[in-house]
């Protein structure tokens, strides 16, 4: 019984720790599980893919990352 309680406590701690370490994205962006962020140089995200699918920041809507990693409309690139 003690080992079961210990496992439950460890599981709760792991969930809590995962939430603390959550990715913080810049203004006008959000976390997604897509490997291909859109940028001024690659507005469709076809050439900027990372090899591992993981949570990364992506600009919201029709915005793209500029060279300073700020989400801007494509017209401002």
Swiss-Prot record:
Gene3D superfamilies on file: Laminin (2.10.25.10)
Superkingdom of this protein's organism: Eukaryota
Annotated site location: Reactive bond: 51-52
Disulfide cross-links: 25-57, 36-49, 40-77, 59-71
Alphabetical list of Pfam families matching this protein: TIL
Keywords: Disulfide bond, Protease inhibitor, Secreted, Serine protease inhibitor, Signal
Listed GO MF terms: serine-type endopeptidase inhibitor activity
Residues making up the signal peptide according to the UniProt record: 1-22
Keyword Heme applies: no
Tissue note: Hemolymph.
A cellular-component GO term for this protein: extracellular region
Biological function: Highly specific for fungal protease and subtilisin.
Protein family (similarity comment): Belongs to the protease inhibitor I40 family.
Protein name: Fungal protease inhibitor F
Organism per entry: Bombyx mori (Silk moth)
């Amino acid at each position: 019984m003690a080992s079961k309680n210990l496992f439950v406590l460890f599981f709760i701690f792991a969930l809590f720790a995962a939430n603390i370490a959550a990715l913080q994205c810049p203004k006008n962006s959000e976390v997604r599980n897509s490997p291909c962020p859109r940028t001024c140089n690659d507005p469709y995200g076809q050439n900027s893919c990372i090899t591992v699918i993981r949570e990364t920041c992506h600009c919201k809507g029709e915005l793209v990352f500029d060279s300073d990693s700020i989400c801007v409309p494509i017209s401002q690139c």
